[in-house]
């Protein structure tokens, strides 16, 4: 029997709306909120401690792509997940919705997805600012999918369509729906933004008649290029293998797809990033400017890789405030 993405039951947790984690909260404060979520979740069948207020299944039946992992989804000690066979969206509702929404994708080299360290904190921060956040658990290309690297894009495109299909339900403006990705999640969100006309899968229902183009995109220390000398990342290994031909490297390099239809981009990276060469963000910045795509690029001297929404001890903690100002300049926040 087909499941309508708009018919997923809403899981409401006591205190969650009041417990949105803002960037200014201390570490003990964040921990207390997460513990409170755990206690509330225990009262609700099917709920889990770290997630959102609703869960939306992306696909009405088995996802496209063929194959996939066996066994249950796995979560490691850091809160990153892998062995994903059922991609989902978790919804974080603001107390005072602005009508804007953001799809959030954590990183992990397309080998796992950083939910607890990247995606969930970003989602709570967005919700605290009136933005409905949708955290995407996407399929990982390295987990035996016949469609290989395309499966993550299938989930990214479908996620944006499912969000638009649920716009009325969650009080959203279909013209103010963006994406935010970290590291490999930044690569995914960037590819979805730059290749919105690419059909990653055959339509399965009426939801696929909706647009998969985000209206704005935030890419935080993203993987951009899979070409030498920037081909040392797990993202490259997961997407195109150990010895890919040049055309495969180019096809999955984000900057090669930037064109006039690409939405405005907000770009953040630290100059001391030892995982993703900071030159990658500069390449993307240049590609956007060359294609006359509006781009705002913020370089921080110190921050490394994987700083998420930042900590009070480092200047990278400023980027969420800059992001909000950027959204205001785009009239996303009104």
Ranges and model annotations:
Residues 1-28, 39-41:
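N-terminal secretory signal peptides
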Residues 73-78, 206, 222-257, 263:
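Mobile cap/lid helix-loop segments that gate and shape the active-site cleft of serine hydrolases
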Residues 99-107:
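Short beta-strand element of the alpha/beta-hydrolase
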Residues 114-122, 136-174, 311-316:
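Catalytic nucleophile-loop/oxyanion-hole region of alpha/beta-hydrolase
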Residues 158-231, 249:
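Primarily recognizes the serine-hydrolase "nucleophile elbow" in alpha/beta-hydrolase
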Residues 267-269:
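Short beta-strand/loop motif that positions the catalytic acidic residue
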Residues 272-276:
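Acidic catalytic loop of the alpha/beta-hydrolase fold
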Residues 278, 282-334:
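C-terminal catalytic histidine-bearing segment of alpha/beta-hydrolase fold enzymes
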């Amino acid at each position: 029997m087909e499941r309508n993405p708009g018919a997923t039951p809403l899981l409401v947790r006591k205190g969650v709306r009041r417990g949105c984690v803002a960037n200014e909260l201390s570490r003990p404060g964040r921990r207390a909120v997460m513990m409170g979520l755990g206690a509330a979740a225990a009262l609700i069948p099917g709920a889990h401690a770290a997630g959102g207020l609703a869960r939306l299944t992306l696909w009405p039946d088995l996802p496209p792509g063929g194959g996939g992992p066996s066994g249950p989804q796995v979560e490691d000690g850091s809160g990153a997940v892998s062995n994903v066979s059922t991609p989902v969206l978790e919804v974080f509702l603001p107390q005072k919705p602005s009508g804007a929404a953001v799809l959030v994708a954590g990183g992990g080299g397309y080998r796992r997805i950083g939910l607890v360290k990247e995606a969930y904190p970003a989602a709570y921060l967005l919700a605290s600012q009136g933005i409905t956040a949708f955290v995407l658990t996407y399929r990982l290309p390295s987990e035996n999918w016949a469609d290989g690297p395309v499966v993550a894009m299938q989930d990214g495109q479908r996620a944006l369509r499912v969000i638009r299909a649920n716009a009325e339900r969650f009080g959203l403006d279909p013209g103010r729906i963006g994406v935010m990705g970290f590291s490999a999640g930044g690569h995914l969100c960037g590819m979805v933004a730059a290749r919105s006309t690419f059909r990653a899968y055959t339509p399965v229902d009426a939801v696929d008649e909706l647009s998969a183009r985000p209206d704005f995109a935030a890419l935080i220390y993203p993987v951009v290029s899979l070409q030498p000398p920037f081909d040392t990342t797990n993202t490259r290994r997961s997407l195109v293998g150990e010895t890919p031909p040049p055309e495969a490297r180019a096809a999955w390099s984000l900057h090669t797809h930037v064109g006039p239809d690409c939405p405005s981009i907000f770009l953040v990276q630290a100059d001391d990033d030892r995982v993703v060469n900071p030159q990658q963000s500069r390449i993307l910045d240049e590609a956007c400017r060359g294609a006359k795509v509006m781009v705002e690029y913020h370089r921080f001297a110190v921050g490394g890789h994987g700083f998420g929404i930042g900590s009070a001890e480092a200047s990278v903690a400023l980027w969420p405030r800059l992001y909000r100002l950027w959204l205001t300049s785009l009239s996303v926040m009104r």
